[in-house]
Amino acid sequence: MAKVLVLYYSMYGHIETMARAVAEGASKVDGAEVVVKRVPETMPPQLFEKAGGKTQTAPVATPQELADYDAIIFGTPTRFGNMSGQMRTFLDQTGGLWASGALYGKLASVFSSTGTGGGQEQTITSTWTTLAHHGMVIVPIGYAAQELFDVSQVRGGTPYGATTIAGGDGSRQPSQEELSIARYQGEYVAGLAVKLNG
């Protein structure tokens, strides 16, 4: 049995929705045990609420538990072309895992969201840097998801990982195409994890 963690941060719910789709895809793979967790919120509760943050039900992960999984699929919104501060804070607490090599050889993949599309790919690839320092095996999705070839509408999705465009005010929710790409990412990574660890 390969253990797959979908680990995300979501303030307004876009990445939470994408995380569920990623987990849905991963759950299709026989021999994959899929868990969805989120990183802790770092904003004071009053500010989070005032900013319109969405209450979420996924359990909160601890950095130490990352070592328990064979594959981790990270989801983060874009903050100035980088991962969110909450995800950065969480990953900055993995120094002990780095020192012991606990994540070395584990699969890692990333999905993201942006307001207008700016920074989608940069967020994913800049997140890869931290994962590479852990010796994780980076898994992009390439162009295997057919939705990536559709240019008839505005949508997220890159060969690096699934993405969604939230709109400047956050009112746009992930489209069916974007969710399909996210499901593909989950299924693809989980399939690899089972082949390597199952």
Swiss-Prot record:
<dbReference type="GO" id="GO:0008753">
    <property type="term" value="F:NADPH dehydrogenase (quinone) activity"/>
</dbReference>
<feature type="binding site">
    <location>
        <position position="51"/>
    </location>
    <ligand>
        <name>NAD(+)</name>
    </ligand>
</feature>
<dbReference type="GO" id="GO:0010181">
    <property type="term" value="F:FMN binding"/>
</dbReference>
<dbReference type="InterPro" id="IPR037513">
    <property type="entry name" value="NQO"/>
</dbReference>
<comment type="function">
    <text>It seems to function in response to environmental stress when various electron transfer chains are affected or when the environment is highly oxidizing. It reduces quinones to the hydroquinone state to prevent interaction of the semiquinone with O2 and production of superoxide. It prefers NADH over NADPH.</text>
</comment>
<keyword id="KW-0547">Nucleotide-binding</keyword>
<dbReference type="InterPro" id="IPR029039">
    <property type="entry name" value="Flavoprotein-like_sf"/>
</dbReference>
<dbReference type="Pfam" id="PF03358">
    <property type="entry name" value="FMN_red"/>
</dbReference>
<feature type="binding site">
    <location>
        <position position="12"/>
    </location>
    <ligand>
        <name>NAD(+)</name>
    </ligand>
</feature>
<dbReference type="InterPro" id="IPR010089">
    <property type="entry name" value="Flavoprotein_WrbA-like"/>
</dbReference>
<comment type="subunit">
    <text>Homodimer and homotetramer; in equilibrium.</text>
</comment>
<protein>
    <recommendedName>
        <fullName>NAD(P)H dehydrogenase (quinone)</fullName>
        <ecNumber>1.6.5.2</ecNumber>
    </recommendedName>
</protein>
<feature type="binding site">
    <location>
        <begin position="78"/>
        <end position="80"/>
    </location>
    <ligand>
        <name>FMN</name>
    </ligand>
</feature>
<feature type="modified residue" description="N6-acetyllysine">
    <location>
        <position position="50"/>
    </location>
</feature>
<feature type="binding site">
    <location>
        <position position="169"/>
    </location>
    <ligand>
        <name>NAD(+)</name>
    </ligand>
</feature>
<dbReference type="GO" id="GO:0003955">
    <property type="term" value="F:NAD(P)H dehydrogenase (quinone) activity"/>
</dbReference>
<dbReference type="GO" id="GO:0042802">
    <property type="term" value="F:identical protein binding"/>
</dbReference>
<dbReference type="GO" id="GO:0005829">
    <property type="term" value="C:cytosol"/>
</dbReference>
<dbReference type="GO" id="GO:0032991">
    <property type="term" value="C:protein-containing complex"/>
</dbReference>
<dbReference type="GO" id="GO:0050136">
    <property type="term" value="F:NADH:ubiquinone reductase (non-electrogenic) activity"/>
</dbReference>
<feature type="domain" description="Flavodoxin-like">
    <location>
        <begin position="4"/>
        <end position="189"/>
    </location>
</feature>
<dbReference type="GO" id="GO:0050661">
    <property type="term" value="F:NADP binding"/>
</dbReference>
<keyword id="KW-0285">Flavoprotein</keyword>
<dbReference type="GO" id="GO:0050660">
    <property type="term" value="F:flavin adenine dinucleotide binding"/>
</dbReference>
<keyword id="KW-0288">FMN</keyword>
<keyword id="KW-0520">NAD</keyword>
<dbReference type="GO" id="GO:0006979">
    <property type="term" value="P:response to oxidative stress"/>
</dbReference>
<keyword id="KW-0007">Acetylation</keyword>
<dbReference type="GO" id="GO:0016020">
    <property type="term" value="C:membrane"/>
</dbReference>
<dbReference type="GO" id="GO:0051287">
    <property type="term" value="F:NAD binding"/>
</dbReference>
<feature type="binding site">
    <location>
        <position position="133"/>
    </location>
    <ligand>
        <name>FMN</name>
    </ligand>
</feature>
<dbReference type="InterPro" id="IPR008254">
    <property type="entry name" value="Flavodoxin/NO_synth"/>
</dbReference>
<feature type="binding site">
    <location>
        <begin position="10"/>
        <end position="15"/>
    </location>
    <ligand>
        <name>FMN</name>
    </ligand>
</feature>
<feature type="binding site">
    <location>
        <position position="98"/>
    </location>
    <ligand>
        <name>substrate</name>
    </ligand>
</feature>
<comment type="similarity">
    <text>Belongs to the WrbA family.</text>
</comment>
<feature type="binding site">
    <location>
        <begin position="113"/>
        <end position="118"/>
    </location>
    <ligand>
        <name>FMN</name>
    </ligand>
</feature>
<keyword id="KW-0560">Oxidoreductase</keyword>
<dbReference type="InterPro" id="IPR005025">
    <property type="entry name" value="FMN_Rdtase-like_dom"/>
</dbReference>
